A protein has these predicted regions:
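Active-site anion-handling motifs in enzyme catalytic cores
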Residues: 1-181
């Protein structure tokens, strides 16, 4: 924000990502279950290299189907669209990710998730975006650490949803004010 203010000599306002403005029910209206299996599954979606710690979690949950989006070795899920993405997150037992949007949809759809740092030099700035999301919505406990196994399936997002309502109102106020100018 300070950088923007210095560059354009104007006040900058941080608002939530537009994906957070829609409700879970609104996102579910566009969901598409054509790729969603009937059995219980864990969803992995990594944009960078698969981080350390993923294997330990997957070893703990043996016997549960693993769906890996963005995995060259699992063709069934390599070309899903937004509707399938939303549905897979909505019905997963657990999501393991380094993706901002997978984290957003996990929170919105009340799905258990664990966020990992992205280990890819091209995407180092994305970690700060995810950190900001987790901090804003008081979900720092969803970040991978040595004690994550104790809270793997927790989905206590009550505080996050209260904050989200305020953030949505702020977004709409900003949008209305900006459009009137």
């Amino acid at each position: 924000m300070e950088i923007i203010q210095e560059l354009i000599a104007a006040d900058a306002k941080r608002v939530v990502d537009p994906t957070l403005v829609l409700t879970a029910d609104e996102w579910r209206k566009i969901s598409d279950s054509s790729y969603t299996p009937q059995e219980e599954y864990i969803l992995t979606y990594f944009l960078g290299e698969q981080p350390n710690g993923v294997k330990a979690i997957l070893d703990k949950v043996q016997g549960v189907k693993i769906i890996a989006i963005n995995n060259l070795f699992q063709d069934d899920y390599s070309e899903i669209g937004p509707g399938e993405f939303v549905d897979l997150i909505d019905h997963a037992k657990l999501i393991l990710t380094d993706s901002f949007h997978a984290s957003v949809f996990s929170m919105l759809l009340n799905s258990a998730f664990v966020v990992f740092d992205r280990h890819d030099d091209r995407y180092t700035t994305m970690n700060s975006r995810i950190e900001n999301l987790l901090c804003t919505f008081q979900l720092e406990d969803r970040k991978y650490d040595e004690k994550i196994m104790e809270r793997l399936y927790e989905k206590n997002y009550k505080k996050a949803y209260t904050i989200l309502e305020k953030e949505r109102a702020s977004f709409m106020s900003f949008l209305n004010k900006t459009l009137k100018q």
